[in-house]
């Protein structure tokens, strides 16, 4: 092989490799294998800030981030939801993205109270959904579906328990929690979460959507 041929071979090899790395840096998820499935979200029914019932069927076909908070929290919750608002701002115009914020203090957080809280954040109620319900259902969903608290924690004497977590779960269009549980207080994990959302948004939904009591493709 001539020196000229070797030069062109090396040149185009470097060019191809460089092109791949450029794509990887500017396109979240490019070249990444499918994220592992951590759990399947179990059926749930909660009430949102507008007093409407929201179930797992209402969010089929959507990628969403799930978190837990309470409106009277003066510790980590304001920080978490400031960080969450950054995610909201990036994806608020994406039709297949939602945020689900569940209260961990339903005795205090009535529909009116979570509505007031949502309004204070100045967000679209159809994009960032705040949820309340029974303490047992909320805590069971956090532990069994979203893995945001140790699932081994006893569900007995639930009235004496208080779930307070800084973690976020990322759910795909088919109701599966994917890749990892993210620390909502760490900037590097928040950036990772933002990029992982973009990856899941490109994946197809394989389950039938359910909307207004009618199945739709």
Predicted stretch roles:
Residues 154-217:
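Thiol-/selenol-based redox modules, centered on thioredoxin-like
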Residues 41-42, 64, 165-167:
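Short loop/turn microsegments at loop-to-beta-strand junctions
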Residues 55-84, 100:
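Short active-site neighborhood of thiol/selenol oxidoreductases, capturing the structured segment around
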Residues 1-43, 210-217:
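N-terminal targeting signals for export/organelle localization
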Residues 115-165:
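Short, internal strand/loop/helix patches
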Residues 96-109, 126-138:
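Thiol-based oxidoreductase modules, predominantly thioredoxin-like and allied folds used
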Residues 44-63, 88-91:
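A short beta-strand-turn-helix
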């Amino acid at each position: 092989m001539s020196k000229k041929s070797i030069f062109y071979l090396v040149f185009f090899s470097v060019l191809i490799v460089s092109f791949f790395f450029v794509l990887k840096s500017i396109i979240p998820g490019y070249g990444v294998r499918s994220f592992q499935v951590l759990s399947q979200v179990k059926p749930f029914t909660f009430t949102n800030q507008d007093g409407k019932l929201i179930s797992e069927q209402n969010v089929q076909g959507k990628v969403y981030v799930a978190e837990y908070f309470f409106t009277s929290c003066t510790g980590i919750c304001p920080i978490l939801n400031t960080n969450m608002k950054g995610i909201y701002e990036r994806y608020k115009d994406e039709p297949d993205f939602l945020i689900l914020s569940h209260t961990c203090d339903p005795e205090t957080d009535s529909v009116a109270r979570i509505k007031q809280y949502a309004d204070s954040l100045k967000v679209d109620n159809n994009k960032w959904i705040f949820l309340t319900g029974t303490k047992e259902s909320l805590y069971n969903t956090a532990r069994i579906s979203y893995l945001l608290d140790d699932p081994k924690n006893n569900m007995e004497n639930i009235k004496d328990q208080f779930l307070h977590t800084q973690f976020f779960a990322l759910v795909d269009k088919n109701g599966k929690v994917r890749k990892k549980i993210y620390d909502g207080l760490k900037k590097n994990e928040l950036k990772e979460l933002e990029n992982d959302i973009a990856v899941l948004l490109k994946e197809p939904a394989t389950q039938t959507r359910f909307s207004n009591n009618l199945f739709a493709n």
